[in-house]
Amino acid sequence: MERQVLLSEPEEAAALYRGLSRQPALSAACLGPEVTTQYGGRYRTVHTEWTQRDLERMENIRFCRQYLVFHDGDSVVFAGPAGNSVETRGELLSRESPSGTMKAVLRKAGSTGEEKQFLEVWEKNRKLKSFNLSALEKHGPVYEDDCFGCLSWSHSETHLLYVAEKKRPKAESFFQTKALDISGSDDEMARPKKPDQAIKGDQFLFYEDWGENMVSKGSPVLCVLDIESGNISVLEGVPESVSPGQAFWAPGDTGVVFAGWWHEPFRLGIRFCTNRRSALYYVDLTGGNCELLSDDSLAVTSPRLSPDQCRIVYLQFPSLVPHQQCGQLCLYDWYTRVTVVVVDVVPRQLGENFSGIYCSLLPLGCWSADSQRVVFDTAQRSRQDLFAVDTQMGTVTPLTAGGSGGSWKLLTIDRDLMVAQFSTPNLPPCLKVGFLPPAGMEQEVVWVSLEEAEPIPDISWSIRVLQPPPEQEHAQYVGLDFEAILIQPSNPPDKTQVPMVVMPHGGPHSSFVTSWMLLPAMLCKMGFAALLVNYRGSTGFGQDSILSLPGNVGSQDVKDVQFAVEQVLQEEHFDAGRVALLGGSHGGFLSCHLIGQYPETYGACVVRNPVINIASMMGSTDIPDWCVVEAGYLYSSDCLPDPNVWSEMLNKSPIKYTPQVKTPVLLMLGQEDRRVPFKQGMEYYRALKARNVPVRLLLYPKSTHSLSEVEVESDSFMNAVIWMCTHLGH
């Protein structure tokens, strides 16, 4: 019988990609103030922000759309769009004032290389104020990221709080003629006489930053803008050893609450790392005193003030251990100064019970109107669901469990009106609203669609639960299972001719959930089945599962993926002679392990910024702690090369299995990757070339670890499918 013909002509694949990549992604939503009509009806506006790939401009564009939600206080009466979408250019951050009468916007303007930042205040139908932050020179660029960045209105709506890079002193050469002062001594010439005078010899002084995707972000400061006067103050009192972020105004505007990350003795990469030592602080605006509000030996993130301004909820994690773990939800009472753990770490899921908190950030709006419950989304095995937590009782109640098995994301909740996103592997994101029911009735949420997406035809999906064989059980953590999401063409002419692409996720402590993902959907439309494996160590399955992997990378995770592949091939009867691998970062690490340890299984391999040699990565990555911890050791900032540790790192690395590799490999590397430097992939490229294994390398000069820029993402997809089609055969 002839093998199934894949959609493999480049022009056909490009046309398919062009169509599917137009699906927009929701990035944010906020709710306007409640309006009562002259007839007594009540409504609120929903302002949403979206991103979409633009293949003509080769960039991600951002646009907004408004909706109206009419309601009767506890249910939605009518909801619909208010006009068409409008592209928003240059907006970095935006935030409505507490009353909803004003809006602050951080905007960049100007040509590339000469961009300036402006902070604008809008009121009704006009721009009330605009401040050229770049020209004022009080600080460096404003942080717009979700790690440190914030834009917070004071409760009085007279001041704005934000985070920016500390202003760096000017520097110049010792031989800068115009700066020489022949009357001064050597000491006087080397020191600035006034704050703005340049320091000689500091032109090439190294400034640390916070690693991958945080280039030039190293020394954040808290800044306050007085809207009336236009005066900007850089707050004092923050400890010298701490980098502040995620700040908001304390009750009564008496000061500022912020999360502070330790940057001594040096900074480590912070993106996707919830384990960086940090704590909660309060800095008094009158006296400049700084007070510690939480345990300073752990890691905290996303403090959120309750509507009654009495409580602060935040997430807490252990520090300097695996990057992503099961977290605690903590509550700090502003007036009693007592902290309690509302939701603790869950070692193991029992039946259908809650398996723990794995999100790295709480939504900016997460409190119920009565300041008693907190709503958030988190992975639960291979799904992502919404939950409500009673902060007094500690009870966790699902809001979206059951149903069609897709995944949810909370965008915001305000006065109990929730705005959420829902999607599945064959359904792009839908925008939904619903009221949070009274306590005890949470599972009765009635969701109303504001923006409905059309399901992508001819794609079906399911979740497979997998139990490792007895010989692969973990000695300490016995009985752990794991899952895989299988996405496949709905009605292939002959299932035995369907090729399969195996996709292990990166991290390793992350997970795939049953949400919309462009790449698996594309592969499925081309005729492939896609197997997304949540091996033991993935988030969403309890803390025991996460702790089972450090010290066992390169073996336990590899065996889990291979076991999933063999089980699915056996049950689904796909074409076992046409199986490919596609993985990035730790997923690339696993892919390279699999073609070395199981060379007969895989006919093609595509890897993006893979970890190849943990030992050689140690000295160049922004996360050296990852190398040590995942190899099974404890990390400390003063650790030096140890032959035993490095030997273990090498033994757990894919480079060890290179002699067995015969699968054709396509490497895709970002030259600006700080997480897994591209030299890792180069090391593998040379090793394969020396052994005459078919290998191709794509090096993207300005791309980072995720290879997510539109031009890079689209090019890498096309090259990946052509590589797989070529080496698996049509």
Curated annotation (Swiss-Prot):
It is found in: Cytoplasm. One of its GO terms (cellular component) is cytoplasm. Its EC number is 3.4.19.1. Expressed in lens (at protein level). The keyword Ion transport does not apply. Homotetramerization is required for activity. Tetramerization results in the formation of a gated channel which is involved in substrate selection and substrate access to the catalytic sites. Homotetramer. This is Acylamino-acid-releasing enzyme. It comes from Bos taurus. The gene is APEH.
